[in-house]
């Protein structure tokens, strides 16, 4: 571990002890996380005694599921699941990669993140309840708000929150987990408390997953700030890591270019 990674580890240990952190999160989907980056995050996560969550590339992303199994992921999320049929494809893909025994240690959830998917809320929650492989829903507020034509600034507004609360009520009725993400910040604390009052299992920032009850904690704003600091350090670490790789052969490239110029003259 380098100095920055040790600082990231300290932030995660503090988050677990003081702010209700449950897991570190990465994405093969929107972030395009590479495997070497993923392994750095996994090491930090394990040393902090946290779980690890991974958003795969789609409902039937078999290779992503295989790599998730090899790495040892605790939460797997399928993005942009728009229909009950897509949800069945996700459950089938999980069953092909993870046998019944292996599924016991992993939670598989789908992202509900568009107004089109919400139109199928009842059927998709019923399908999730029926599928032995699946356990819940992740409500992605940013994409949902944009898909409904409301804009990103509406994520903490009444309209988007009402959609989340309806989803929460349905998940509670069926005994499903509900996780809320998308633009979670200190501005989200009041609406997170509303969600907890109905039904909420976890909420998440881009890189950190919290226990839902931490939304009611006195220092949740500090917990969210801590998560932002972690993400910033992660991005700086990622930038420097690839810059180092990019510079590895700089001297040899310079030498070969000069040699080529001499031989080609």
What spans do the regions from the language model cover?
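Expand to "…catalyze enediolate/carbanion chemistry for C-C bond making/breaking, isomerization
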Residues: 1-265
């Amino acid at each position: 571990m380098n100095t920055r990674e040790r600082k990231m580890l300290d932030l995660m240990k503090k988050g677990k002890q003081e702010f209700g952190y449950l897991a570190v999160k990465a994405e093969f989907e929107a972030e395009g996380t590479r495997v070497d980056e993923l392994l750095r995050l996994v090491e930090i996560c394990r040393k902090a005694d946290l779980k690890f969550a991974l958003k795969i590339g789609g409902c039937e992303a078999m290779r992503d599921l295989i790599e998730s199994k090899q790495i040892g992921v605790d939460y797997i999320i399928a993005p942009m699941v728009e229909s009950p049929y897509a949800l069945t494809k996700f459950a089938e893909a999980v069953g092909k990669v993870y046998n019944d025994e292996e599924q016991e240690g992993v939670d598989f959830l789908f992202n509900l993140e568009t107004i089109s998917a919400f139109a199928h809320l009842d059927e998709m929650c019923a399908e999730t309840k029926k599928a032995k492989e699946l356990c819940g829903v992740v409500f992605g507020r940013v994409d949902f708000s944009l898909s409904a034509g409301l804009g990103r600034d509406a994520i903490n507004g009444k309209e988007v929150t009402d959609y989340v609360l309806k989803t929460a009520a349905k998940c509670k009725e069926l005994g499903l987990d509900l996780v809320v993400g998308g633009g979670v910040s200190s501005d989200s604390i009041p609406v997170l408390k509303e969600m907890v009052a109905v039904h909420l299992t976890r909420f998440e920032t881009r890189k950190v997953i919290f226990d839902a009850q931490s939304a009611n904690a006195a220092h949740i704003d500090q917990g969210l700030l801590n998560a932002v600091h972690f993400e910033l350090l992660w991005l700086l670490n990622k930038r420097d890591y690839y810059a180092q790789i990019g510079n590895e052969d700089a001297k040899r490239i310079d030498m070969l270019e000069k040699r080529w110029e001499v031989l080609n003259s």
